[in-house]
UniProtKB/Swiss-Prot annotation:
Gene of this entry: disco
The keyword Metal-binding belongs to this UniProt entry's keyword annotation: yes
Protein name (Swiss-Prot/TrEMBL): Protein disconnected
Biased composition (Acidic residues): 235-246
SMART domains per record: ZnF_C2H2
Native organism: Drosophila melanogaster (Fruit fly)
Main localization, broad class: nucleus
Annotated Low complexity bias: 30-45, 282-292, 391-402
Highest taxon of source: Eukaryota
Comp. bias intervals (Polar residues): 253-263, 558-568
Amino acid sequence: MEHIMNPFMSPAYLLGHGPHSHQHVHSHLPSHPQPNAASPASSPGGSSGSGSGSAAGSGTGSGSSLKPRRWGSPPINLAGQFINPATGKKRVQCSICFKTFCDKGALKIHFSAVHLREMHKCTVEGCNMVFSSRRSRNRHSANPNPKLHSPHIRRKISPHDGRTAQQFPVFSPGTAAAAAAVAGRLPVAFPGLLPPPPPHHGHHPYVMFGGQAGLHGLGLLSTGCQDPDSGSVDNEQDADPEDDNDFVYVDMQANSSSPAASSEDQEEHERDNEQDEEMHCSLSLASSSSIAADEERAADQPLDFSLHKRRKSEQDREQEQEQEQEREREAEKEQEQDVESDKEHEPEQEHELEREKRSPSDAFSMDQLLGKRKRHDSTASSSACSTAAASSASSSSASASANPPQTSIKMDLDPDSDSAYMTSRRQMLPLPVLDLEEHHHLRLLQTQMFAAAAAAAATSQAPPTAFLPAGSPVDLAKDSPPMWSLLSEMYRSMLLKTQHQQYNHHHQLQQQHQQEQHHHLTLSHHHQEQHHHLGHHHMGHHHHHHHQHHQQQPQQQSPAATNAPISV
């Protein structure tokens, strides 16, 4: 095997090799530090005389006729030779980047080109590409294509072009660990052999891709951090074309411990300009990495557009319901505080409030909630009951002052409570602002109605609890209509109502509130007036909302033709 004398080979490599006329066997030890070895390579023939006996690990006798059976010494065989079980072919593996080659010549070329490089940086400003030869660097710098000089936009390597990207070591884990330990000690013994650590290199893929972003997009690395010795997968030209048969290709470029990884395959690809059709931006991979992470989290669901939409609408609805629940609890606490202030005007009222906040006994119970749900559904389903419902609503608002906590338990599964919240906010606003708020609310309702219809189309047989939070112990009544149909009914009825009706209604209700509040404020102390205002606003808007809803029942039942295609 003739020597390839290269001006870029390191002095340590060239030390023992003069221009010999005969061929001889090298036991080349790239990553095995030996304290007494003058050079990492020596010949068994002893012609160079610079190596120690232990370095000549392959004693093959006549070096001129035989190829060496292995490089390196037996304990840590760093140029690892292994036999592919599928094809029976012998291959050698680079100990640093774990790529495999068909023979040692290819490995030696790879090693001197990739791991012994002298760096030539591109002269275009903003480009961090580094090359092992000036010729490659000059040709790269002369190319005006901006895609070559921007570090984030990479080219796709065809997985069938005969280059292996062997990602992980083929030896046993123990050997790999020992090799890693030796590689960690290397820079002390041979300064030129290993590249400096990644964070100092602007061109290193770790820096270029901002951590693991590219690999997340490929789905190949989880959130753990990158192995320092997990190998560079720069795709070399000198890996032989038989590699197609032997290995599964892992086509990725973002994981590398040699700083040459990115530059090397850039350089390779400049050489074959006819493959320019294959260019693509792996920036899109990096940018879609968050989406890919979400997909992995919900990987049990097939990637279907309608299912995605349904999942999103479920999450949105769960969040809405949780917010409604919190709102209900706050309103309730304030009303109960009002009741206590009516009953007892002693100074220990603050202790009472604290105790009540700590253990809200009747603040929120599922049974009352469900009873309310069933009653609400039964009145909503028949239009015949609507007059009775309206009268009962007015009577309950009359008895509001008698029993505040009971009436304040408005069920949080009732889909209207966010609109109730909006109307309550509207009552507290001055009247000119009302129009803008109203428009916003109607637009919001419209979009929610569309989302509900889409979700219904996606899950035509979904159980009525499809949109409830996952852990909620709610068992709805068997015959209750599904949640989305209630939603769409309610939204449509709210859209049918005109602005004028609401304006008049608010006027009447505000006068009514003011009378009630005046009556109640005479009972309470002066320092509790603010609490009182708030509580009665809430109470008033709850009853107003029930009243509103029952008033709209005949309107809801009328458009039966539009109702037909939506109903499950």
